[in-house]
C-alpha cells in the first residue's frame, strides 16, 4: 500500500479534480504490475496497473492493492470494479472508502458480490491524508481552504503606512507562487488588492494561474489594478457590477444580510472548485479563522521587525502545528482538526 501511495502522488497535477490513486498488482509476493491515475478523464490507476501486467493469466491468482476504493459508476471512464471482476482477480486490498456520493462502498460491495475477497482500511489515515483536498470537497461540500501570510518577527503583517510591506524574501516568495500553482482559486480582500496591487499569478513557479477572487462589496476598486489586467480570470464578489467592462472579470453577488463566507464557499463548490488559497489581509484571514472555515495555514515568520502596524491574524489552538523550512524561510504549518 505504501507503494500505491508513492505512485498516487505522481498524479498531483494531472489527476485533479479526480483523486490521486495508485494501484499495484502482486502475484506470489512479487509486484507484476502497477499504475496511477495520470490525468483527469484518462484511465484510472487500476486500469493502468492491470494493463502493465505482461502475463494476464496470473491475475486470477493475484492481489490488487489500491489506495482508494475502485469506482462503481460510469463517468468519463467505465467502472474499475467491473474491470477487476472481469479479470477474476483473487483479492483486492483497499486503502480507504471513496467519499464520492456515487461510490461510497458500492465498489467494494460489487467486488464482494462477485466472490472477490476484499480487505479495507490498510494505511487508511495515510490514504485519506493524501487526498485531503478531495475528501474535504466531497464530505464538507466546500473547497479545501489554505490560509497563507507572512508576519514580522514581532507579529505584524504590514506597516501602518499604506503600500506593500516586504516581509518575505525573493526566495520565500517562490513558496507563495508554489502554493498558488497548487490551488484552483486565490482570494484577497479589497484593501490588499488596493494597497499591494498583487497580480496573484504563478509567474515564479511552473503551473496554471488560479482563478482570482477579490472581496469588493461596494465595487469601489479602480480598473487599473493588476487583478483586472486579463492575465488570469477574476471573480469579483460585489453588490453590483463595475461601471466599465474589465477583461476576464465575472461577478458573484451574495446576500450580504447572510454570512458571506458560507455563501462564497457554497458557490465555489457548485462550480466544482476543490481548493482555495486565502492570501489576506488580516481582516479576511481572521474571518476564515473565526468561522472555522479553514483547513491548513502556512505562516512565514520573517526576520525583520516592524515598528507598529497591522497585527497578524490570531490562530486558535490547533491539534497539528509544525515548523518547516521552505526556500530558506521559517514557516509554521498548522492544520485545523
Show which residues each predicted segment covers.
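Zn2+-dependent cytidine deaminase-like catalytic core
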Residues: 25, 30-126, 211
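Short low-complexity, flexible loop/linker segments enriched in glycine and/or proline
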Residues: 107-109, 133-136, 202-204, 293
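Active-site beta-strand termini and strand-to-loop segments that position acidic
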Residues: 27, 139-140, 335-337
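N-terminal glycine-rich anion-binding loops that anchor highly charged ligand groups
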Residues: 15-29
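Proteins enriched for Cys/Gly/acidic motifs involved in redox and nucleic-acid/cofactor modification
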Residues: 14-15, 41-42, 108, 122-150, ...
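Short, well-ordered, mixed-charge alpha-helical segments that flank or form enzyme active sites
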Residues: 73-75, 100-103, 126-130, 153-158, ...
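Enzymes that bind and transform nitrogen-containing heteroaromatic metabolites
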Residues: 1-19, 34, 54, 144-337
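N-terminal pre-triad scaffold of radical SAM enzymes
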Residues: 62-72, 140-151
Amino acid at each position: 500500500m505504501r507503494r500505491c501511495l508513492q505512485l498516487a502522488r505522481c498524479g498531483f497535477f494531472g489527476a485533479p479534480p479526480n483523486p490521486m490513486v495508485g494501484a499495484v498488482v502482486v502475484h506470489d509476493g512479487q509486484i507484476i504490475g502497477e499504475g496511477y491515475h495520470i490525468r483527469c478523464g484518462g484511465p484510472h490507476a487500476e486500469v493502468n496497473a492491470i494493463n502493465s501486467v505482461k502475463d494476464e493469466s496470473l491475475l486470477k491468482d493475484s492481489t490488487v492493492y489500491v489506495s482508494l476504493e475502485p469506482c462503481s459508476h460510469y463517468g468519463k471512464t467505465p467502472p474499475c470494479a467491473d474491470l477487476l471482476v472481469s479479470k477474476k482477480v483473487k483479492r483486492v486490498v483497499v486503502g480507504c472508502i471513496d467519499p464520492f456520493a456515487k461510490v461510497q462502498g458500492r465498489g467494494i460491495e460489487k467486488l464482494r458480490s462477485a466472490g472477490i475477497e476484499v480487505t479495507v482500511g490498510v494505511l487508511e489515515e495515510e490514504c485519506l491524508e493524501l487526498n485531503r483536498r478531495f475528501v474535504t470537497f466531497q464530505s464538507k461540500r466546500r473547497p479545501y481552504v489554505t490560509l497563507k501570510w507572512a508576519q514580522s518577527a514581532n507579529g505584524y503583517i504590514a506597516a501602518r503606512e499604506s503600500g506593500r510591506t516586504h516581509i518575505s524574501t525573493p526566495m520565500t516568495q517562490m513558496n507563495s507562487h508554489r502554493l498558488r500553482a497548487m490551488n484552483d482559486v486565490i482570494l484577497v480582500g479589497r484593501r490588499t488588492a488596493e494597497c499591494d496591487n498583487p497580480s496573484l499569478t504563478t509567474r515564479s513557479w511552473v503551473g496554471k494561474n488560479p482563478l482570482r477572487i477579490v472581496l469588493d462589496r461596494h465595487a469601489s476598486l479602480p480598473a487599473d489594478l493588476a487583478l483586472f489586467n486579463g492575465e488570469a480570470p477574476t471573480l469579483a464578489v460585489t453588490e453590483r457590477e463595475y461601471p466599465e467592462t474589465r477583461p476576464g472579470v465575472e461577478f458573484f453577488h451574495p446576500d450580504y444580510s447572510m454570512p458571506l463566507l458560507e455563501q462564497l464557499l457554497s458557490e465555489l463548490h457548485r462550480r466544482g472548485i476543490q481548493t482555495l488559497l486565502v492570501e489576506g489581509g488580516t481582516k479576511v484571514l481572521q474571518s476564515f479563522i473565526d468561522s472555522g472555515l479553514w483547513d491548513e495555514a502556512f505562516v512565514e515568520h520573517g526576520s525583520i521587525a516592524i515598528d507598529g502596524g497591522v497585527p497578524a491574524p490570531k490562530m486558535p489552538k490547533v491539534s497539528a502545528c509544525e515548523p518547516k523550512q521552505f526556500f530558506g524561510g521559517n514557516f509554521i504549518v498548522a492544520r485545523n482538526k
